[in-house]
């Protein structure tokens, strides 16, 4: 369930004025606690459940979980720090923030963490014990002060903060070393700052992170759930020396914020390594030469290269001497070099030797691996071994070996026969609903995957990531199918997927319920006992069942066939999606990028630019590709080709009848074809983005082309390469493209170099995968050379011109 649906649930189940009360809780969709001390109560809303937790007197309520369909609330003494979490359907877990926090605000009067040692390392005495010290403060004398176990507390408002009685007979009490919460101050470089400062150093108001005005940007809160990009508060999502924000001044894109450093010692760092693990952010070895053998510049020096990656700006990153480090979240340790001609370079650090590759343990660098050519699973999907890694709401799956953001026991070691590779959808616990995965969204523990049973996609086809499978029309009446999650489904199916008859929505037997009735939801189509989806459940239509021991279950409603003759952005041959570092890319699977065209001169037939089919009659390319001639008859377009020179009989060659240049001199142009292209498995348009859509930073996208390959294998055949999008704020740094990239452009590439678009790729597509299709986000435009380190390629941002594109096509 995505964030919008969670918000809708809150609105549905909260009473007026109760929303703010939940600010003190952390919510996790799909998580249930194993609790020993709990109460199970009837509750008609989240607000009811919240009130029961806040008013509990038999024990301290640290969490509650709400089951909407059961109208049930479970309030608990435990939380995820003290108890194990299991995945569960249709439940939201709410945990009180104060009991999850291990930091203090102010003097720590409200601290409720679990620190139980003093500054000098002495174990604390239990507050309820009378030996070795008879306490003045105890649970019985001060019941509201949280005097549990032997945890550090501040029941007397001591100005020096939390303390405890000690187990040392000679030391009655001592203070504890509790770090400050990063709300009024910051540790390190403010990566975990969660305060509410929303003005820059010069006093400018910050722009809200979920706004794209006045500055469009790629730090989209929904794409970076772990970065806490709330409201317009200063944050540090990209490894800067301190928190910053985009400003509301159109003439000032961004600026640092003035956040003071905390005066107490920072929290203890995690484990450090003398070898490479993950991205190497915790590498503390002494390698001091780059991959090409250049000596590293000392981090504290400013010659030959001036920079702000200094020990003062990054006090927690151990920037000692000239050792290779990764202070800012790069893909590997690096350093500035002592060569004035090479600003910086990655280092070669020996791997720690784990059998698990770094990429597998780091969900942030895992590629998107959801097939567009639809895979399916047999039965309940326990045997599914495909490469889908996206949930049914479009969330990215967490790697099975990773414990971030969700800790779990479904690991390859615990389930060796379950095929738990990378972050691919699997079914290790034999879930009857099919393959699932943990998500990379901290607020959504897990979801089912964006897959269908083979019986719903044509049936009987073996599961494979390679074999194309084209969905067939469902064998039911035209109206008895659903679009999306089936919220608008009004068919007459009245049995669950397991074959159990549905209970009528107006009935209260065998199951009594108050929320989902024809009276409470008059627009939800709750007629008779038909399957419906009144709460927008991502798993589709459901019903209360006639089985007294089964409250509800889901129905098996097929998806409706597409209304259009083709679907943009969906190739019929699965792309290779090679993650290699088209200089340095790999040869594409033939016809796996069916919108790619070759722009040629009509008479010589020589390829000189790429382009993208966006409708049967229109191609999008770069304006600079049309400098050879202003006459449309000079050009022709080749569609459905894989080889640049050897054109098969199924390749389409179509003349151009009109050239339309963008009126404000942007490097983008439309070509109208002399006749509509024939849509085949080899020729399919790409999808256009929504107007002004901004691709999130680090999104993995793909470029294709027949351009210059600099001697790498595959020349003459269509090549592909995977590139991460780089936020313009980063791309415009002095060491990269030095403010050359406009807001109407985007850049993408590997800063280490080695892979890029090149001459002959101009005008071609940069497409990004979104849930189930490829969207054309960029037109290959320019770069400083090909595949040079620190010089990513630049692409026209298509979303800024969608209104112009659609207007020209419509008015022609």
Swiss-Prot record:
GO molecular function: apolipoprotein binding; endopeptidase activity; enzyme binding; kinase binding; protease binding; protein antigen binding; protein domain specific binding; protein-folding chaperone binding
Signal peptide: 1-19
Domain Peptidase S1: 582-810
Name by which UniProt lists this protein: Plasminogen
Primary residence: secreted
CDD domains hit by this protein: KR, PAN_AP_HGF, Tryp_SPc
Lineage: Eukaryota, Metazoa, Chordata, Craniata, Vertebrata
Catalytic residue list: 624, 667, 762
Similarity-based family: Belongs to the peptidase S1 family. Plasminogen subfamily.
Regulation acting on activity, per entry: Converted into plasmin by plasminogen activators, both plasminogen and its activator being bound to fibrin. Cannot be activated with streptokinase.
Disulfide bonds listed in the record: 49-73, 53-61, 103-181, 124-164, 152-176, 185-262, 188-316, 206-245, 234-257, 275-352, 296-335, 324-347, 376-454, 397-437, 425-449, 481-560, 502-543, 531-555, 568-687, 578-586, 609-625, 701-768, 731-747, 758-786
Source superkingdom: Eukaryota
Free-text comment on this protein's domains from its UniProt entry: Kringle domains mediate interaction with CSPG4.
InterPro entries in the cross-refs: Kringle, Kringle-like, Kringle_CS, Kringle_sf, Pan_app, Pept_S1A_plasmin, Peptidase_S1_PA, Peptidase_S1_PA_chymotrypsin
Subunit structure: Interacts (both mature PLG and the angiostatin peptide) with AMOT and CSPG4. Interacts (via the Kringle domains) with HRG; the interaction tethers PLG to the cell surface and enhances its activation. Interacts (via Kringle 4 domain) with ADA; the interaction stimulates PLG activation when in complex with DPP4. Angiostatin: Interacts with ATP5F1A; the interaction inhibits most of the angiogenic effects of angiostatin.
């Amino acid at each position: 369930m995505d964030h919008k649906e969670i918000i809708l649930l809150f609105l549905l189940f909260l009473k007026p004025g109760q929303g703010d009360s939940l600010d003190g809780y952390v919510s996790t969709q799909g998580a249930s606690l194993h609790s020993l001390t709990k109460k199970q109560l009837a509750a008609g809303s989240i607000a009811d459940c919240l009130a029961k937790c806040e008013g509990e007197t038999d024990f301290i309520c640290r969490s509650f979980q709400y089951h909407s369909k059961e109208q049930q609330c479970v309030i608990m003494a435990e939380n995820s720090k003290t108890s194990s979490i299991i995945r569960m359907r249709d439940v939201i877990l709410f945990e009180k923030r104060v009991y999850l926090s291990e930091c203090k605000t102010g003097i720590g009067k409200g601290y409720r963490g679990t620190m139980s040692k003093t500054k000098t390392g002495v174990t604390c005495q239990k507050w309820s014990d009378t030996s070795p010290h008879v306490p003045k403060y105890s649970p019985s004398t001060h019941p509201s002060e949280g005097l549990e176990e032997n945890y550090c507390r501040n029941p007397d408002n001591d100005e020096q903060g939390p303390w405890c009685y000690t187990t040392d007979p000679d030391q009655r009490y001592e203070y504890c070393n509790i770090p400050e919460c990063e709300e009024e101050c910051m540790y390190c470089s403010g990566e975990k700052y969660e305060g509410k400062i929303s003005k820059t150093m010069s006093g400018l108001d910050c722009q809200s992170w979920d706004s794209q005005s006045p500055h469009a940007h790629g730090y989209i809160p929904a794409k970076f759930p772990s970065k806490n990009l709330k409201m317009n508060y200063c944050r540090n999502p990209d490894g800067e020396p301190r928190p910053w924000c985009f400003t509301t001044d159109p003439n000032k894109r961004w600026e640092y914020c003035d956040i003071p450093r905390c005066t107490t010692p920072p929290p203890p760092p995690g484990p450090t390594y003398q070898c490479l693990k993950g991205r190497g952010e915790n590498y503390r070895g002494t390698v001091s030469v780059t991959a090409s053998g250049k000596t590293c510049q000392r981090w504290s020096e400013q010659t030959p290269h001036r920079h702000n990656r200094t020990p003062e700006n990054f006090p927690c990153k151990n920037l000692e001497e000239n050792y290779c480090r990764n202070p800012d979240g790069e893909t590997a340790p690096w350093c500035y070099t002592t060569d004035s001609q090479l600003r910086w370079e990655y280092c070669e650090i020996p791997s720690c030797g784990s059998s698990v590759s770094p990429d597998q343990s780091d969900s942030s660098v895992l590629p998107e691996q959801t097939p567009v050519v639809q895979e399916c699973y047999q039965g309940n999907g326990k045997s599914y071994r495909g490469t889908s890694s996206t949930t049914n709401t479009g969330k990215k799956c967490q790697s099975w070996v990773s414990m971030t953001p969700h800790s779990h026991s479904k690991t390859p070691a615990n389930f060796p026969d379950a095929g738990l590779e990378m972050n691919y959808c699997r079914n290790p616990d034999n879930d009857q609903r099919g393959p699932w995965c943990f998500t990379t969204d901290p607020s959504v523990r897990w979801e089912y995957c964006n897959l269908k049973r083979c019986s719903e996609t044509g049936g009987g086809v073996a599961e494979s990531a390679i074999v194309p499978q084209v969905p067939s029309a469902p064998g039911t009446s035209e109206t008895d199918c659903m679009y999306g999650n089936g919220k608008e489904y009004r068919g007459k199916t009245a049995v669950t997927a397991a074959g159990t008859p549905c209970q009528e929505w107006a009935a209260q037997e065998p199951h009594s319920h108050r929320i989902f009735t024809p009276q409470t939801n008059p627009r939800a189509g709750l007629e008779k006992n038909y399957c419906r989806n009144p709460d927008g459940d991502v798993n589709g239509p459901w019903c209360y069942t006639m089985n007294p021991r089964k409250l509800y279950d889901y129905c098996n409603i097929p998806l409706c066939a597409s209304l259009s003759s083709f679907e943009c952005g969906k190739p019929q041959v699965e792309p290779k999606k090679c993650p290699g570092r088209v200089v340095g890319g790999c040869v594409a699977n033939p016809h796996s990028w069916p919108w790619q065209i070759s722009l040629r001169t009509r008479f010589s037939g020589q390829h000189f630019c790429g382009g993208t089919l966006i409708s049967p009659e229109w191609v999008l390319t770069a304006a600079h590709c049309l400098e050879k001639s202003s006459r449309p008859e000079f050009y022709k377009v080749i569609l459905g080709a894989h080889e640049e020179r050897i054109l098969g009989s199924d390749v389409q060659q179509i003349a151009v009848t009109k050239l339309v240049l963008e009126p404000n001199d942007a490097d983008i142009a439309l070509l109208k074809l002399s006749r509509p292209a024939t849509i085949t498995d080899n020729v399919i348009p790409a999808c256009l983005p929504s107007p002004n859509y901004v691709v999130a930073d680090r999104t993995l996208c793909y470029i294709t082309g027949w351009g210059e390959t600099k001697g790498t294998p595959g020349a003459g055949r269509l090549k592909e390469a995977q590139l991460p999008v780089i936020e313009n704020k980063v791309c415009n740094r002095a060491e990269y493209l030095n403010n050359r990239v406009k807001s109407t452009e985007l850049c993408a590439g590997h800063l280490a170099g080695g892979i890029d678009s090149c001459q002959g790729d101009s005008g071609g597509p940069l497409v990004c995968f979104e849930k189930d299709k490829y969207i054309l986000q960029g037109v290959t435009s320019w770069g400083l050379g090909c595949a040079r380190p620190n010089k990513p390629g630049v692409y026209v941002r298509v979303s800024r011109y969608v209104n112009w594109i659609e207007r020209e096509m419509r008015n022609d």
